Amino acid sequence: MKRFSILLPLVILIASCDGVLSSTSSLVTTSSEIISLSSSTVSGSTSQLSPIVTIDLYNLNDFHGAVEHNPSNKEIGINRLAGYFKTQLASNPNSIFLSSGDMWQGSADSNITRGRLVVDAMNQMGFSAMAIGNHEFDWTDDYLFLNQTRSDFPLLGINIMTQATNQRAAFADASIMIERSGIQIGIIGTIGASLESTILTSAVAPYDFVPYTNLVKDESQRLKNLGADLIVLLNHDGTVESGVMPYVDAVFNGHTHRREVFHVNGKPVYQGQAYGQAISHVRFAFNTANMVPSFIQNQSGVYTYESLSSSNQFPQEDEEMKALYDTYLVNEINEVKNEVIGEAEEALTRQQLGQFAVDEMLRFAQTVKEDVVASFHNSGGVRATIDQGQVTYGELYKAFPFDNELMIVEVTGTQLLWWLSAGLYQKTVPNLTPVDENQSYWIISINFLTERHLESSSYPHDLDTAINTYQYIREQLKTRWLSEGTIRASDYN
């Protein structure tokens, strides 16, 4: 099979919707230092006059259903995102659009449709592959299977294993091979081997996330045997297993919502923040006239980025995407999302919303069981702030997107002391302390936390006496807001 040398393997870019790229890497330089190739030798396709083919890889990570344009949080939204991708594809037909996971869960727009809207949008934008992230499991594997069937692209997760069979999960592919102008690009997907702990225990119980270095090594070799000229890893984790780097040419990370620009042994490892706030972009150039399968390192050491401001790089909404989104809004979303639930006298921070949540949890718990003495909620379950003024259910949904059920559980005094020292949002009844270690107490928390005790000693409680209220904190806060009308942030400092 014909093989090509990579003439400029690493011209690496990251796009930022706020026009600023923060990086401590000394290898990140300004766009004026981009290596210049004449138009007679660089092309998006192979021709006699243009032996150099450029492949542009664009990756979106941790989108979390941020389909609505939200300039205050630098969220570009799907209409403008589609416009940007369409422009890039017109500029270079060899552009490839990818995702390193956590695409569906996180907004009313996406959650109401269980990710269906985001999948349809990705189909319309022409995504080629997506790694499975931990939050793709939030609605159990039922929706992984449903969204896999709906997707025009594969969901990748080479190290997601079904416990019962020790085989890769049926909804997860190991890789995909993509061809552009005679260049074969192998795409492999992984998820961090420790990320089961970030998922509701019952939702991920049938699966294990195993270490993936050897799996990637073998899959990379298989793809190269099939003719791959380039191997790209989509990795849903903030770090990549070090043993993987000899077997891939570029890595797109996710999960930690950081903006990262660095390299390992000359190979790019990128992450583009979250919510569409940044887009990672890596460019490779191939010399199709060279038949020798060699990897030519870029001796100049020039790495570059371009800042893509939402004001001047995303000026137009894509009309086709707007039509898709508007249809969803009218038919399924607006009636729920736009319900006004009250007022915020001041803006509420995530910390204040967390305290508001445990305040309401304790009040609600005592209507179910009057001797509940404390409430607990994790900080990671509060995902956004709420602005001053009129508050809609959609805003509350974005702050509390997870469908975690409120659980009332019995604990010993010793176990209660563990909860009190766990660093959670918490509220207790007056005069709870000193805690009697030999006495029994009742507390309320969310099942994301209580289910952790099924597999570990953390979040201890009596499993046999637990009471599931089948209520979500989001719904309880909505009811509270509707009842009180106005919520004051200062009440929850």
Q: What spans do the regions from the language model cover?
A:
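Bacterial N-terminal signal peptides
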Residues: 7-16
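Glycine-centered small-residue hotspots that permit tight backbone geometry or close packing
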Residues: 18-19, 101, 189, 431
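Catalytic centers of hydrolytic enzymes
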Residues: 53-56, 60, 65-71, 82-84, ...
